[in-house]
Amino acid sequence: MIRGFGMDTITLAGSLESKLGAIKAAGFDQVMLSARDIVGHPGGVQEAVAAVKASGLRPTGFQVLRDFEGLSGHLHDYKVDIAKAMLEMCAALNCKVLLACSSTSRHATQDLDLIARDLRKLAMLAVPLGIKVAFEGLSWGRTINEFTAAWDVVCRADAPNLGLGLDSFHVFAAKTPLDAIETLDPAMIFLVQLSDLMWHETPTFEERMTTARTFRVFPGEGVHSEPLADLVLRLDRLGYEGDYSFEVFNDDYQQLPLPMVAQRAQRSAIWLNEEVLHRTRPLPLGLQRKG
C-alpha cells in the first residue's frame, strides 16, 4: 500500500466504481473526489457515497467550490447556497476537506479584507460538519493567483478550519519562488496537490488555464521534476505531515485504460516516496517475513 499519496477521480475515464477500483488496485489508500463523479452517478448521490465507502479508500478531499469569495448581494447569496450543498455532500462522504479555489470572476472585489471575510464565513459554515476548507490560489485567479496571496487571506480570515491548498501546477505556472514555502505554517496546509507539465513556461492566464485543464502529467513525467522534488522536500523539512494528491487533468489519459493510467500514478508515488523522500515502502502483508 502506498501511503501518503492518492489519485484524483478527475484523472480517469469511466464509472466511479471503475475509477475507485483502478486506484485501489494500483496500491493507493486514498482518493480525491470530484463532485461531478458523485452527482453524475447513475444511481444518484446515495449510491455514489456507498461506492466510495465500499471501496475502502479514504477520501483525501472533495472538490471544487469555485468563485465563492468577494461577491455581494444576490451573487453572494447564491454562492452560499452552493457552498452549503457541497459541504453536505462532503460530510456524507465522510470527507474532512473541501477544496475552494480563488475567484476568477470580474464581479468579485479585489479588497483582501472582504475576501478574507467571505472565506471566514465559508469556514464557519463548515464547522458544524467537522470539515476543513483548503483555499487554493489559481494561477489565473483575478486577485489571488499565487499561494503567497492565498496564505495572506487565510491568515487575515483567522479561522482554525481554514487553511491552504497548495497545487504544484499553479506554483510553477506563476513562478512563485519556493523559498516562500518557509513562511507557511505546516499545520495550516490542509492539502497538497501534485502534477507536472510539459511546458517550461505558461506566461498568460489563458495558457495556464488551458494547460491546467487538459495537459497536466504525473510528477516526474514533465519538465519540472527537479523543482517538484524540491517543493516536496521543502514541505517535508517544514514539517508538513498531510496528504499528497495527484491532480492530473489530461485529455490523453482520458483515452487510455484505467489500469495503465493508475500505474503511471503508482510510478510517480514510488519515485517521490523512495527516491525523493527516501522513505521505505511497507511490504504487503503476504510478503512480510514471518517470525
Stretch-by-stretch model annotation:
Residues 1-96, 127, 163, 194, ...:
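N-terminal pre-domain/capping segments
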Residues 9-16, 33-47, 67-77, 104-113, ...:
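Acidic-and-aromatic substrate-binding clefts and catalytic sites of carbohydrate-active enzymes
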Residues 24, 91, 185, 236-237:
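Non-catalytic positions within long, well-ordered alpha-helices that form the structural scaffold/packing
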Residues 28, 95, 189, 240-241:
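A structural motif
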Residues 30-31, 62, 121-225, 276-279:
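Acidic/histidine-rich catalytic cores of soluble enzymes
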Residues 243-248:
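Short acidic/histidine-rich active-site segments
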Residues 223-238:
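A short, acidic, amphipathic alpha-helical segment used as a generic capping/interface helix at domain edges
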Residues 17, 69, 73-164, 173, ...:
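Active-site acidic/histidine proton-transfer and metal-coordination neighborhood
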